[in-house]
Structures are given as C-alpha cells and as structure tokens.
C-alpha cells in the first residue's frame, strides 16, 4: 500500500476508503465535504450523482488547491425516482418495500481534481435485482441497523447481500467506488 500525501479523499464513507485501499492507495488525508446533497427539481439520477460528486471535490479543492482531491457519490433509483438515504425505520421500510422484487439502478460517479485545475470523472450505472421481500424479512433487516447511511437503505456487503438475485455492472460501484474507473483516473497521476 502506498500513502500519497498529496491525495485527499473527499468523503465520510468508510467503504470508499476501504475500496481505495484495495487499489493499494492510502490518501494523505480525508476531508468530509459539507455540501447540500438535496436533489434539484426533476434532476435525473445520473446527473444528480455527477453533480454531487463534483461539488464534493470542488468544495475541498477550494481549501487545498495544490492537492489532488478524489470524491464520489452513489445514488439508488427506481425509474427516475431518486431514493434517499433513509433517516428513520419507517423510511427504510418504504424504500425496501419499493425495491423488493424489482430491478433498481445504482449510479456512482467519481471525480478527481488535479492541482492543474483539471477535472477527471467517470460515472457507472449498475442494475441490481432484489428478491421479493416479506414484511418479516424487511423488519428483521431494519432491526440490524445496516440500512443507516446507505443509499437505497441497502448494505449488500452485509445482511442485505442475501437478498440480491443479480448485479449487472460493477459490484464495487454499488458499495461506493467503481474500482476500475477509479484506477483508470488515478493511474494517470499516481504509480499504482
């Protein structure tokens, strides 16, 4: 693993740091960007994901203009409806009931700000199909608390993994950072 002192991860996500570590990369610093992540009116999920990831990177780059800043955003959607990170058990129940037995899309966008003021980005769409969930299964999952802070109230690395019928696309993207795309961007500047 290589520590890159001139790389900042703009994220509060432990999963993103773990995924970045899988690439052999340890950022010199982690900075949590404080931005408004509310979707704009009629904003499409992919555009939302790209905008929020870019805003995270730009916000941190204003504080550290001479550093590389890596940021990402993951959004889950059913149709054009962006599913929020549930804040209550009732919201988690509604979201899980909505994706139960259906395919839903997960968009993750990753941005890298370079000190030359150049922005690099990639956006990945993955389709996930969840089995039809019983009320008992949903309630049991909610009791686990794993839904907290997760896009779509679903943690496929944990208990929710047993509900996944199929994933068409990038598994790491669903967790929060598309490894191939992140590697492609970072390898332009870092020896990884």
UniProtKB/Swiss-Prot annotation:
Disulfide bonds: none annotated. Its cofactor is a divalent metal cation. Its EC number is 3.6.1.9. One of its GO terms (cellular component) is cytoplasm. The active site is at 73 (proton acceptor). It holds the Pfam family Maf. InterPro entries: ITPase-like_fam, Maf-like. It is an enzyme of class 3 (hydrolase). It comes from the Bacteria. GO terms for biological process: nucleotide metabolic process. Keywords: Cytoplasm, Hydrolase, Nucleotide metabolism. It is found in: Cytoplasm. GO terms for molecular function: nucleoside triphosphate diphosphatase activity. Nucleoside triphosphate pyrophosphatase. May have a dual role in cell division arrest and in preventing the incorporation of modified nucleotides into cellular nucleic acids. PANTHER family: BIFUNCTIONAL DTTP/UTP PYROPHOSPHATASE/METHYLTRANSFERASE PROTEIN-RELATED, BIFUNCTIONAL DTTP_UTP PYROPHOSPHATASE_METHYLTRANSFERASE PROTEIN-RELATED. NCBIfam families: maf (TIGR00172), PRK14366.1 (NF010946). Belongs to the Maf family. HAMAP family: Maf (MF_00528). This is Nucleoside triphosphate pyrophosphatase. It comes from Ehrlichia ruminantium (strain Welgevonden). The lineage of its organism: Bacteria, Pseudomonadati, Pseudomonadota, Alphaproteobacteria, Rickettsiales.
């Amino acid at each position: 693993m290589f520590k890159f002192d001139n790389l900042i991860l703009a994220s509060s996500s432990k999963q993103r740091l773990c995924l970045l570590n899988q690439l052999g990369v340890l950022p010199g610093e982690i900075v949590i960007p404080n931005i408004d992540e509310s979707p704009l009116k009629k904003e499409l999920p992919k555009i939302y994901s790209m905008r929020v990831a870019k805003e995270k990177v730009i916000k941190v780059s204003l504080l550290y203009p001479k550093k590389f800043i890596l940021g990402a955003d993951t959004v889950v959607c059913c149709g054009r409806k962006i599913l929020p990170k549930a804040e209550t058990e009732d919201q988690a129940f509604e979201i899980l009931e909505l994706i139960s037995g259906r395919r839903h899309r997960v968009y993750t966008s990753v941005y890298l700000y370079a000190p030359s003021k150049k922005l690099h980005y990639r956006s990945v769409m993955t389709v996930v199909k969840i089995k039809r969930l019983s009320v008992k299964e949903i309630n049991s999952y909610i009791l686990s608390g794993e839904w907290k802070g997760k896009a779509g109230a679903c943690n496929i690395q944990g208990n929710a993994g047993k509900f996944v019928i199929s994933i068409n696309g990038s598994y790491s993207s669903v967790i929060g950072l598309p490894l191939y795309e992140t590697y492609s961007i970072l390898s332009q500047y870092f020896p990884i």
